[in-house]
C-alpha cells in the first residue's frame, strides 16, 4: 500500500503537465490497488 502512495507523489500535478500514458497507468495502478 505504501508503494502505491509513494508512486502517486510525483503525479500530484495538473493532468495537462503529465503524458496521457502516465495518467492512464497511474489510474490503473490505483484501481488495482484499491
From Swiss-Prot:
Function summary: Probable toxin that belongs to the MSDIN-like toxin family responsible for a large number of food poisoning cases and deaths.
Origin: domain of life: Eukaryota
One GO molecular-function entry: toxin activity
Glycoprotein among keywords: no
Gene: MSD3
Listed transmembrane segments: none
Organism: Amanita bisporigera (Destroying angel)
Modifications the protein undergoes after translation, according to the UniProt entry: Processed by the macrocyclase-peptidase enzyme POPB to yield a toxic cyclic decapeptide. POPB first removes 10 residues from the N-terminus. Conformational trapping of the remaining peptide forces the enzyme to release this intermediate rather than proceed to macrocyclization. The enzyme rebinds the remaining peptide in a different conformation and catalyzes macrocyclization of the N-terminal 10 residues.
Protein keywords: Toxin
Keyword Mitochondrion: no
Residue location of crosslink Cyclopeptide (Phe-Pro): 11-20
Similarity comment text for this entry: Belongs to the MSDIN fungal toxin family.
Protein name: MSDIN-like toxin proprotein 3
Propeptide: 1-10, 21-34
Amino acid at each position: 500500500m505504501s508503494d502505491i502512495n509513494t508512486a502517486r507523489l510525483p503525479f500530484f500535478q495538473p493532468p495537462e503537465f503529465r503524458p496521457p500514458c502516465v495518467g492512464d497507468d497511474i489510474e490503473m495502478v490505483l484501481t488495482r490497488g484499491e
